[in-house]
Amino acid sequence: VGKTLFTTGYSEDNQGAAYADNGEGFIEKKGGFIFENALEMFGAGDDKTLLAMEIARNLPTRRLHIIDAETGLVKQISNINIFVEPAIDPRETKISWPTALKVRGDKLFIPFQKIKNEFDDKGAAVDHGTTDPDEAFVAVFSYPNIGTDPEKIISDNRTSNIGVNGATTGLIEADNGDLYSFSCGAVMAGFSAASTKPSGILRIKNNETEFDSEYFFDVEAATNGGKLFSLDYAGGNKAIARILTNDSGNKWEAFGRTVFNQKL
């Protein structure tokens, strides 16, 4: 974030730290913080603010940390409900898996996938599946005064859920302020079941909080069946995309090294 490098632990390591150039050519620790569950989604409020989110697999509430990049200290922690659809059996309850934290102006956009609140008899979370893969979802919150619940949730059925597990760029911002989302929907990227909708890109215009009904980039049509696996903004209204050339492997296999079917 800005000129600050953040590091965070995972699993049993619940500590984070901020580092920066001390002005004498050396990297120096500026501060640190702790968290309860692993931080698995990140974004920037601005050049001086890190957003980091705890995403417990068996809890519906998401814990958002707002961290000062200049001190490395937590300024605010908010418990938010991105999406919850209760069920009589708690294991059938649908909750959110966020795939980006994107601030634009006075809004925080959080694209998400719907997953089941599944856990085993010992209370441990199990591998989750995408329960509604044929639609894109974004929760829109106020910012920086973040409420417990989103102002609204927008959706689009022209493509699949936005983003993939482990990536933080489900939404990117162009120079003119327009936001672009990427949808994958591939089994090899962790979707279960696979989406029947084409992998593609949607747009939310600057100063708008709805998907642009006049814009849709069909990635599968443009790449002879390829699916977006990542999308990173490169400046000048251009982005670098990583494409899965096919989706013939097993679940999560795109993250491994046994099959290589990716191209830029």
What are these regions, as identified by a protein language model?
Residues 53-57, 111-135, 181-198, 242-262:
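Short, conserved, GDST-rich strand-edge loop motifs in beta-rich repeat architectures
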Residues 18, 62-72, 123-147, 194-209, ...:
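Beta-propeller blade signature
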Residues 212-264:
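Intrinsically disordered, low-complexity segments enriched in Gly and acidic/Ser/Thr residues
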Residues 128-202:
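Loop-centered beta-sheet repeat module
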Residues 25-37, 73-91, 133, 147-159, ...:
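Beta-propeller fold detector
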Residues 1, 34-47, 86-101, 161-171, ...:
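Repeated scaffold domains used in trafficking and secretory/extracellular systems
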Residues 2-4, 47-49, 105-106, 176-178, ...:
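Short coil/turn segments that connect the beta-strands within blades of beta-propeller domains
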Residues 1-79:
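Post-signal peptide N-terminal segment of secreted/secretory-pathway proteins
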